[in-house]
Curated annotation (Swiss-Prot):
This is Translation initiation factor IF-1. Transmembrane segments: none annotated. Its main location: cytoplasm. Residues 1-70 form the S1-like domain. Pfam families: eIF-1a.
Length: 70
């Protein structure tokens, strides 16, 4: 279960509120994503236009977790 995660690259379209973002993935699908815990702890700033890596659970492909800014 823990190793069944999907990783895709996307571009931040807008900040919804707080740590929630709207992301356009490389396959032209728009999803919502939130910051991973380590990124919150390090207070990483994410702005519209940034390219990020998004992690998905195979059970819910509409909500992702931003794990890295590229």
């Amino acid at each position: 279960m823990k190793n069944d995660k999907l990783f895709l690259t996307g571009k931040i379209l807008e900040i919804i509120h707080g740590d929630k973002y709207r992301v356009m993935l490389e396959n032209n699908v728009e999803v919502d994503a939130h910051l991973a815990g380590k990124m919150k702890m390090k207070r990483t700033k994410i702005l519209p236009g940034d390219v990020v890596e998004v992690e998905f659970s195979p059970y819910d492909l509409k909500l992702g977790r931003i794990t890295q800014r590229k």
